[in-house]
Amino acid sequence: MSFSEDSDRWQQAVYYFTGYDAPHIDKLFTEWVGNDDIPLMKVELTKQSRVTYVDVDDLQWRVDNAGRGVNNTDFVIPFYKTGNEEESGKDAAGDQVTYYKARFTLLGNHNGKDRPTGGVYEGGENKAKYDNDFKKSDEGTTWDTGPHTQYSYGTGRALEALLDNDGGTRGFEWNGLDVPAERVVDLASFARAAGAFDRVAQFYADRQAVLEEWHKRVGMEENDAWKGTAAGVFWDLIHTLGKRYEDYADDLRKGAMFSVPGDAIRIAGSVFQKEARKLQQHWARWEIKDGNPLSFVSDLLSEIVDHVWDTNITNITYKVHTAARGETRTTYHATGNFRQDAVDKNGKNYGPLNSLDTWKAVGAAAIERWKKSVKENLVDNADLALRAVHDAWSPSVFDVGTIKTSSGDSLSQDYEKDKADKEKKEAEEKAEKYRKEQEAKEEKYRK
C-alpha cells in the first residue's frame, strides 16, 4: 500500500474541513474477518465424495455479481487436485485427481433488500447466518464493518453536512461517531466574521464623521487659554478620537459597504467551501463504484476462477476401467497443462487452491486493491484540496490589512504637557514683563 495512517490525507482533510475524526485506515479491517483470520470472507474447503464434471450452477455467482454490484455473497469455486494435500500440482500430467469445492461467504452488505452495494450504509457488528454448507461450529462467527463504514461513508456524509446543513457539522453523527461541539465547522462563520469587520469599519467611519463635526465646533486648533484646563482635556479628547477613528476607518473600509479584513475572510471562506465541494464530489463518484471492498473480493475471485477454468477445470480427462466381470469404473486425470494454484489476471500466485492461507492472502490482496482506489480517488485529491486552502490562507495571500493606532499621548499626558506648556508660557511672559519693567526703570534713571 502506498499510504498509511500518517499519510492518509483523506482522513486528515475531512477532520480539518468538518471536525469528523474518522477511524484511521490501518484500523478498518482488523475486526472484519471470518474463519482463520481470513479478511472479508468465510472459506470452507470440502473434498467431494466423488469426482465428476463441474456443475455450472456453482459459477452462477459470476453472473449475479456482474458489474459493481454484489448480489450474491455465497460463492463456490470448484477445482480438481492431484496428489496429497501439500502437493502443488506441477508436473501432474496423468495423475489421478480428486474433486474439491471452495465455498465462500462474503461478510458484509450486498444488493437486495438490505441496500445497494454501491451506496452508503451504516455498518456494525454482525453474526454469521450460514446454511448447511458450513459447519455448525462456525455459526457464531462475528465481524464488524463499523470502522470501515465510518471511514468510507461517514467522511462523505460529514462533508455533505458541512455544505448543506444549517449549522454545518453541528449535531452530525455517523454510526456512533459524532462531531463534538468544540470541533464543529460551520461555513456561515466566515460570513459572520466578515460581517463583524464590516460593521466595525462602518462604526468607525460613522463616528469619525460625528467627531469631525464636534472638532469643527470646538475649533480645529486648540485655544491657548484652554491648555492645562478641563476644556483643553476635552479638546484633546475630540482631536485624538477623531484622528484615531479616521485612521481606523481608512485602514478597515473597502468601498461603501465592506471592509478589508471582511473581504479577505470572505475570499478565504469561498476557497474553503469550493475545496470542500470538490472533495464531496470526488467521494460521491468513488463510493458508488468502489466504496464497498466486497466488490474487489468478487472481482479478484472472478479472476481466479478464470485461471482455474483455463488451467484446472478444462484440463482433466478420464479413463474407463473394465473389470473381468465386465464392470466399469471411471477415473479422472490431469492433462499436461493442469495447474492447481490461485492466480489472478496479472499472474500473481496466491498459493494452492486447497489452502486456507491462500484465501487469506486473496482477502488481504482485495483490501490492498480497495486501498489503492482510496489513494487514487480520495487521498490524492484531498492532498490537492489541503494545498489549495493552505495557499489561499497563507500570509502572502490572506491579507486582512494593517490596523494601526495613531501615535500620540494619553489624555493625562496631554493634560500634563498642556499644563507644562502653559506654566512655561506664563513664566516666559512674566520674565518678559519683568525685563521690560527693568528696561523702563533704567531708561527713567538715565533721563
Regions found by a protein language model. Give the residues of each.
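Glycine-centered flexibility motif
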Residues: Y80, N84, G108, V185-A188, ...
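Long, amphipathic alpha-helical coiled-coil/dimerization segments that form elongated scaffolds
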Residues: A196-T331
